[in-house]
Every structure is written in C-alpha cells, then in structure tokens.
Regions:
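Long, histidine/aromatic-enriched segments associated with O2/redox biology
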Residues: 1-299
Length: 299
C-alpha cells in the first residue's frame, strides 16, 4: 500500500500553517526540495511525538505535469472562477500544509520548509490557522460537523486507492474573509436558517424547514443515494482587530466531489447561491495534487 502524506488524515488538529507559492525557474530544484522536506517532517515527527504532526506538499496542474511527465492525476486542473467571479481563482504552483497540536512545532516545520525549498519557490501567501472554542468557526457555528470520522472512513474518502496515483489525494484550498459585524446584525434565527443548523446546540434543521439556499443544503449533496463527501482540514485564521475568517482546506480521492459542492454554492447549477455569502466571501482558490510519499521520493 502506498504511504499517504501525513497531513491528510489526522483529526482535531489545534493549529495549521498553509503556504502557497510559485516555482522560480527549473522544476528540478523543486523535486529535490520536496524530498528534503518530507525527510525533515519525519525528523520533526520523531522529535515531537506528542504534537501529532502532519504535513503535505502538493502541486498545481502545470507543475505537476512537468514533475510527473504528464502521468496520472487526470482530474487535476487549474482552479477556475466560479459564480461569475464570486469565487476567484488564485492558482499557484505549490501548496505546503502543516498541522499539529502545537503551533510552535508547526512554525519550526514551516521554517524547515523555507530552508528546503529556498530559492526554488516564491511564497505568495502564508496563513496561520487555529482551532477556536468548541471547534467553532468565528461565526459561532460549529465547523465540520459532517466531516468523515475515523481513519478508515477518512482514507476511503480522501485517498486514491489504485493505479499510479495510489496514496495520493486532490486538495482544494480557499480562504474566506468574514464580515462579523454584518453577521451580528442578523438575528440568531436568521443566522440559523442561513447555515441550516442551530447555533448553540449544533442541531441540523430539517431539509423541508430550511431554505434551499442554506449552506447545508448547498453542500450536502448526494448522487445515486451516496453523499459526495470530502475530508476537511479547515481552521479559523486572522486577527481580532483586522481581517479574519476561515481557511477552507479539503482532501478527496475525487476532485469531482469538491467541484460539485462549489458549483452548488456559487449558483452554477441552479442559479441559487449559498446564503452565507451574505456575511463572508472567498478571496482565494486553488486546486492541487498531493502524491504519495513514495511518488515524491521517485520524482
């Protein structure tokens, strides 16, 4: 069995760092840097076993085609604009995702990543996420209630089983900026109908009682009776005095599942948009492929 990268399956991490970057010059330097980075991660995992450290290095479409010789990751593509511009594309070449129970360990690993990749990349965005009270989003609603639980279930959803891509996963990242003042002008019942869950108790509102534009209705999708699931590794980010929101991060064995949710949220299926756009907006968007550890070492 191919070994999946260690940042894909963990649950309930306390903190994370995401780094998106473009390649500078020859991709051969990226090959070697990626190998060095995964070795560094293993060293930190051995040094800080209590941190439950995980990490991922993933690649955008153009760079992955160069690294892989065009083999595999057939669904991978550049992130397009959705909803006639409501969801912008900020596609980059490389994604580094670090998560654990200890922010200081994450930061040390991020420093090691910068040393490993060096001049091979140009960092375009770096976001530090944190687990908030009761695993809630900054909106006050519990985040990720429908997230698959347990390693076996999460592996089934997130990890490609067979073929040249075995052990790999498609990654989607999208940073959302909240307007909490706008949210707090709404009554709690209105907020609950917008999300599709009660705020305090986190109970699902029945489908025939909540609007079709509620967030839950837009993303709880089924085909042939089977849910289009993704494994989420999202966390709040930001400052109390400035910009804050949710850094959405999801892994899936099929990019299809992720894209169907996006098409539904931004009105590209039936013209109806996710009601949570009343108080929050996406400002970035990227698709990546995270190969197995064996495939990274064979680049």
């Amino acid at each position: 069995m191919s070994q999946v990268q260690s940042g894909i399956l963990p649950e309930h991490c306390r903190a994370a760092i995401w780094i998106e970057a473009n390649v500078k010059g020859d991709v051969n330097a990226l090959r070697e840097a990626s190998k060095i980075f995964v070795d560094k991660v293993a060293t930190f995992q051995a040094k800080f076993p209590d941190a439950k450290l995980g990490a991922v290095v993933a690649f955008g479409n153009t760079v992955w085609r160069q690294l892989s010789g065009g083999e595999g990751a057939e669904e991978l593509k550049d992130f397009p604009v959705y909803g006639k511009g409501l969801a912008p594309s900020t596609q980059y070449d490389v994604l580094i995702h670090i998560l654990s129970a200890r922010h200081e360990v994450n930061f040390s690993v991020a420093q090691a990543a910068m040393a490993a990749f060096g001049d091979a990349i140009e960092v375009k965005e770096e976001i530090h996420g944190f687990r908030w009270v009761e695993e809630r989003d900054l909106s006050g609603f519990v985040d990720g209630t429908e997230n698959p639980a347990g390693e076996e279930t999460r592996r089934e959803v997130a990890v490609i089983k067979d073929g040249v891509d075995a052990g790999g996963s498609y990654v989607f990242v999208q940073r959302w900026e909240h307007n909490l003042k706008q949210l707090n002008r709404m009554s709690v019942p209105d907020q609950e109908m917008m999300i599709g869950r009660t705020k305090e108790a986190n109970e699902e509102i029945d489908g025939d009682e909540r609007p079709v534009t509620s967030h839950l209705s837009r993303v709880d999708l089924k085909e042939d009776g089977k849910g289009l699931k993704i494994v989420r590794q999202s966390l709040p980010y930001g400052t109390a005095s400035g910009t804050n929101g949710l850094y959405f991060c999801a892994y899936c064995a099929r990019l299809y599942n992720t894209e169907q949710q996006l098409l539904s949220m931004f009105g590209d299926t039936d013209g109806k948009r996710d009601a949570m756009l009343r108080f929050t907006k996406p400002v970035t968007g990227g698709y990546y492929f995270a190969p197995s550890l064996e495939r990274i070492q064979a680049l």
